[in-house]
Amino acid sequence: MSEPVVDTAELSAEEKKRLLRERRQAKMSKGKATARLNDILSQGSSVKTSGVKSVLDQEKEATPSHDEDPEIQDITEITTPPPRTPPIGEDAPQDIDKIFQSMLQQQGQGADTAGDPFAQIMKMFNQVEGGDSPPSESATSTQDPAELKYRQELLEYNTYNQKLWKFRFLLVRVSVTLFNFFYHYINLSNFHASNYAYVRDLSSEKYPVRDFFTWFATTEVVLVAAYYSIFHSLGLFHAANQNSFVLKAMSMGSMVLPQLEHYKPLVARFLGYYELLGIVLGDLSLVIVLFGLLSFAN
């Protein structure tokens, strides 16, 4: 169907421009935009180039639709936790032990930690871990796992050695006390307990209990002196007191009252001598039980 013939004389200038624009758009829509563009560009040139392509002839890219299903995410990306971001300028710590040791190292480098509760807590943990020996500079600054393992094994060995020597002394004390008691009981017919003071003050020929207590006191002095000498030479005398409830309570209280740190060595020494007194009281309790059984038998 041909377009109707329009008298151009009767058309105004605006209508002429509109008709020309519509004709150009109709030609462009038929795929001739590239040819027309090349004709315009090649005017005045002896060689025609067809390397230019109009944007009207280019295929439009498909617009992504928001109604489409999203891409399925890999399940491993959900189950695998993201890696922990290390601090700036530092490597990522391997485990909680290294973090704790790093905190101890920073606490050991501080000059004045008396008013810092966190520093006092770190110091208390370090003292409990290290036993009776004070933490040296090399011990607090080391980050070598082999060194930390050695310190842990040394602490376990000292604890085992301490229990072993206590058990040995317990066997010796009980054996000596029983031997002293049964020796007098078997060899002396009048060996028995008495409630009267004048009987206990008699000589060993008339009342052999006095001779028994003389030997008992002598052996106790020898055993206590040997116990102190051996434990002090092995470095175990004060180590047994570091895990006592009193020193732990003082370490906790020193976070509030730092003055308690000055009294801890005195309390530790008192607990050590109290342990020696406990040896004598324990052996004396055994003697009381033996004389009680002897009185019940007679």
Swiss-Prot record:
Annotated source species: Candida albicans (strain SC5314 / ATCC MYA-2876) (Yeast)
Residue ranges that the Swiss-Prot or TrEMBL entry lists as coiled coil: none
Function: Required for the post-translational delivery of tail-anchored (TA) proteins to the endoplasmic reticulum. Together with GET1, acts as a membrane receptor for soluble GET3, which recognizes and selectively binds the transmembrane domain of TA proteins in the cytosol. The GET complex cooperates with the HDEL receptor ERD2 to mediate the ATP-dependent retrieval of resident ER proteins that contain a C-terminal H-D-E-L retention signal from the Golgi to the ER.
Transmembrane segments: 165-185, 212-231, 276-296
UniProt feature, compositional bias: Basic and acidic residues: 56-67
Compartments (UniProt record): Endoplasmic reticulum membrane; Golgi apparatus membrane
Residue intervals on the Lumenal side: 186-211, 297-298
Lipoprotein among keywords: no
Family according to the record: Belongs to the GET2 family.
Principal localisation: endoplasmic reticulum
Residue span of region Disordered: 40-92
Keywords (A to Z) from UniProt: Endoplasmic reticulum, ER-Golgi transport, Golgi apparatus, Membrane, Transmembrane, Transmembrane helix, Transport
Listed Low complexity bias regions: 42-55
Protein name: Golgi to ER traffic protein 2
Cytoplasmic side: 1-164, 232-275
Assembly information from the UniProt record: Component of the Golgi to ER traffic (GET) complex, which is composed of GET1, GET2 and GET3. Within the complex, GET1 and GET2 form a heterotetramer which is stabilized by phosphatidylinositol binding and which binds to the GET3 homodimer.
GO CC annotations on file: endoplasmic reticulum membrane; GET complex; Golgi membrane
GO biological process, one term: retrograde vesicle-mediated transport, Golgi to endoplasmic reticulum
Bilayer topology: Multi-pass membrane protein
